[in-house]
Amino acid sequence: MGICSSTCCGGRARDGLYEPVLADSEREAVADLLQYLENRGETDFFSGEPLRALSTLVFSENIDLQRSASLTFAEITERDVREVDRDTLEPILFLLQSPDIEVQRAASAALGNLAVDTENKVLIVQLGGLTPLIRQMMSPNVEVQCNAVGCITNLATHEENKAKIARSGALGPLTRLAKSRDMRVQRNATGALLNMTHSDENRQQLVNAGAIPVLVQLLSSPDVDVQYYCTTALSNIAVDASNRRKLAQSEPKLVQSLVNLMDSTSPKVQCQAALALRNLASDEKYQLDIVRANGLHPLLRLLQSSYLPLILSAVACIRNISIHPMNESPIIETNFLKPLVDLLGSTDNEEIQCHAISTLRNLAASSDRNKALVLDAGAVQKCKQLVLDVPITVQSEMTAAIAVLALSDDLKSHLLNLGVCGVLIPLTHSPSIEVQGNSAAALGNLSSKVGDYSIFVQNWTEPQGGIHGYLCRFLQSGDATFQHIAVWTLLQLFESEDKTLIGLIGKAEDIIEHIRSIANRQIEPDNEFEDEDEGEVVNLAQRCLELLGQSMSKAHIEG
């Protein structure tokens, strides 16, 4: 609408035919506009006569009138932001293309204000708003740069716009402006770059535009907002394995910068620094680098804070770091065990509980010494106290941790005496396959070479069907893994040479029947790997029957 009028006005003005008419309409529009501005609180500038008066000034060839129009748009959008239509946006977009700095500055401010509204964000891009905004980002005027970047930052918060912005050529100028000496421009540019990091494709475009070194360099900015935007953007970029490889090759100072930011005075920066390190620590190299950069002490401080997001980001990070076997002892020596155990009971936040118990399991994974230290820190007592009442995801992690600790021959008696069977047996009834399997695996580990089997005798039928009920259900489940766990556990119980326990098994006709059924199973040669697994279960079942026969014969002879 507006551009067409402008062309017509420009064309007729040369021969003077309509010049007085245009001048009159402009004078009339100025007078009307002044009257509307007198009553601005009651005037809707986005429709009807007020918008027509503004549009007349916009499409005038008089630069002063264009300046007045752009300043009016900037002023009214400062206090009245709402959804508008193309009749409002097109005049502002026309003003963006003016060569005049004042017009550009005010028009981009107005557009940035309107770009706060969700519907306007989409329409501005649909009407071609990105091209003039990109041009303004390259303006030598800092105010124009600042407003244009601020507008793109707002536009980039809408999912529908992000890919369009990434493909528009805006990322190069945004990356350059992130290094601006003007803090407002820098802040807006890094905010826009952050908004572009929420999808794989856009992150890739950002990396290709050379944003990574700029974001890393700006981690040392004195401005907290810039630190936050850059840390969060790098955290999102580090989600992708290919980007982590690029970061590892080109940014040797990244880990140390993020470790330093965990000591920031701003909790939101601390939080994002820990989350960025957590994403980096998906890779082995970074798991080691964070420990070498003295990242454990600041993580421990965050883990012990009273602010939930800080605790969550720190415990998520330490979980990933603890995956590397070489980090187990350094983490334990930094005194993480007790705080991690305390986290299990001090919050009902499921994520925090999962990360905490998973970290404890990782720390116990590769040495009996570390398993003993985890046990001494009270991890098992805390799990026993909580496990029947926590969400299934936490139950799964807790039972997996107990199963790992139960691998240590030195700790089995201690674990049994703590009463873990009293919670593991009921959890074999869980609706979760994982919880069932972990609980049964823990019972199986505890049944091997334990010395004193009296607790298995005590728990033969209780609680909830006891060891007897659990073995029966797993043997008849039809699940190869469950059957394997149950048959292997039975074999350990037979090998215990505990007469009372073996006598109880011998009298359990249902168990013996299931064992015979498995022992007599014919293996179909369909799948080589399945055959091996099934063959092992059959062999274990046959060995159980053999030991049962020997013990029964021995009992007859002794009798």
From Swiss-Prot:
The keyword Repeat applies. It is a lipid-anchor. Coiled coil: none annotated. GO terms for biological process: autophagosome assembly; nucleus-vacuole junction assembly. The keyword Hydrolase does not apply. GO terms for molecular function: protein-membrane adaptor activity. ARM repeats lie at residues 77-116, 118-157, 159-198, 200-239, 243-282, 284-323, 325-365, 409-448. It comes from the Eukaryota. Pfam families: Arm. This is Vacuolar protein 8. It comes from Gibberella zeae (strain ATCC MYA-4620 / CBS 123657 / FGSC 9075 / NRRL 31084 / PH-1) (Wheat head blight fungus). The gene is VAC8.
